[in-house]
Each structure stands twice: as structure tokens, then as C-alpha cells.
Regions:
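Substrate-binding cleft of extracellular glycoside hydrolase catalytic domains
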Residues: 1-67
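Extracytoplasmic/secreted cell-surface and envelope-processing proteins
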Residues: 37-41, 78-81, 102-105, 140-147, ...
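Alpha-helical scaffolding within the catalytic cores
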Residues: 12, 73-85, 110-122, 144-151
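Aromatic-lined carbohydrate-recognition surfaces of secreted/lumenal glycan-active proteins
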Residues: 26-33, 52-79, 128-141, 164
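Acidic (Asp/Glu)-rich catalytic clusters
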Residues: 14-24, 82-88, 120-126, 152-158
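The substrate-binding groove and active-site-proximal loops of carbohydrate-active enzymes
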Residues: 1-5, 41-45, 98-110, 135-140
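Substrate-binding cleft of secreted/luminal carbohydrate-active enzymes
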Residues: 129-213
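Aromatic- and acid-rich polysaccharide-binding/catalytic face
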Residues: 80-110, 165-167
Length: 213
């Protein structure tokens, strides 16, 4: 069975994520993220949930103990979230909303972030899940998205984490979601305001949480 073999390989990899003392690293595992593009998104709701639970059971059979299961979904403006939520050993809900540099619409971005929180946060609380957000505007456009949109949301709501789209390629390609040295102040000042606010906790403030042996 191809699915069983694939799951065994995933289990073997997860087992390697440990330090020299054999302490395994915890992993938030986004099984079958719903992005509207992959093959399993074409499954019916019931078939999708059945597949999700089957993979969970297969990983349990392989004695995987260092994962926290997450349900992840990409937000599409106007669409309702959480319709495929598996409701089976889920601890984290992640919603992804990224704008590409060719379709930047800052008013829509702000409206969408508010709608995501409105839909997802009460749902997560009702199911005893933590809620995290993966987001960003490619090439940034205006750094007010950090200080005025995202920071405001972080201050008003209990959001467990905030992740941004990845930066990659040459700077001239503008495939970045967070500023880097050399970009204009227009794309930096809002980000600096956000990271310097006490509501945000970055790795440098987590001294002692994880130690390198």
C-alpha cells in the first residue's frame, strides 16, 4: 500500500528529529493542508476526513510520539473556513493567507485578516485548539501591514503564533514577505514597530527554552 509506505517514511524521519540525549523535538504536523489545489482537495468532505484520520492511525501504529496534529487551510476571500475540519486529535488550527506581488490589495488584506480571525478563533476555542496564522504580502508593498493590521490583531486576540511566507531568490525578484537589510524604509519601519512591541515574542527572547548540546 503506497499510503502505508509513505507514512512509514514520514515516521522514520520524525524519529530522527532528536538531540544527542534521545530527546525528540516536538513537531506541529500539518497533515493534508487544504489549499484548493492538491489532489486530496478534490475529495468529498467525508473522504478527506477519512484519509486524514487514516494517516493519523498509521502514524500511531508506527509509535510516533513527537507530533502535535494541526489542521491547516488556505483562506480564500468569500469562502467559509473549517468545513473539512477532521475533529480527531487536533491541537492546532493554522490558516494561511498570502497575497502575491501581482495582486496586492491592502484594504482586502486587512479585511481578510479580520474575517479569518472572526471565523477561526471562536471555532478553535470551541474545540480547545490553539490558532495560528501564516500570512504576508509578497514584496510587502507597505509595511503598515505589520504595525497597523497584524500588530492590532495580535493585541486584540489570542493568536498562538504568526508565521510569514518564505523569503527566497534574488532581492530584485521581490519574493519576500519580511524585510531584509537593504530594503527601503517604507518596507521596514512597520515591521520594526511590530517586533519591538512587547506582545511579540521572538526566538532571541526565549533564552533557555531549547539548549544546543
Amino acid at each position: 500500500d503506497m499510503l502505508e509506505e509513505y507514512t512509514k517514511q514520514v515516521a522514520k524521519y520524525l524519529d530522527t528529529l532528536q538531540d544527542g540525549y534521545g530527546i525528540k523535538a516536538p513537531v506541529v504536523l500539518n497533515l493534508l493542508p487544504v489549499d484548493g489545489k492538491t489532489w486530496y482537495c478534490k475529495l468529498s468532505k467525508d473522504d478527506y476526513i477519512s484519509l486524514y484520520k487514516k494517516i493519523q492511525n498509521l502514524l500511531d501504529d508506527e509509535d510516533v510520539t513527537n507530533v502535535v496534529y494541526s489542521y491547516s487551510e488556505t483562506y480564500q476571500p468569500g469562502k467559509h473556513l473549517m468545513e473539512r475540519y477532521p475533529d480527531n486529535k487536533i491541537d492546532v488550527i493554522n490558516v494561511t493567507y498570502l497575497q502575491s506581488k501581482n495582486a496586492i490589495d491592502l484594504p482586502l488584506y486587512q479585511k481578510s485578516i479580520k474575517e479569518i480571525v472572526k471565523q477561526t478563533l471562536p471555532f478553535a476555542q470551541d474545540h480547545n485548539n490553539v490558532f495560528g496564522l501564516t500570512t504576508g504580502v509578497e514584496s510587502i508593498g507597505d509595511s503598515s501591514i505589520f504595525s497597523e493590521t497584524l500588530l492590532t490583531v495580535l493585541k486584540q486576540h489570542h493568536i498562538a503564533y504568526l508565521m510569514f511566507g518564505r523569503n527566497q531568490g534574488e532581492p530584485i525578484e521581490e519574493h519576500y514577505y519580511t524585510p531584509y537589510p537593504g530594503v527601503s524604509n517604507k518596507k521596514t519601519h512597520g515591521f520594526m514597530e511590530m517586533i519591538n512591541d512587547e506582545v511579540c515574542v521572538f526566538l532571541e527572547k526565549l533564552n533557555g527554552l531549547y539548549l544546543e548540546h
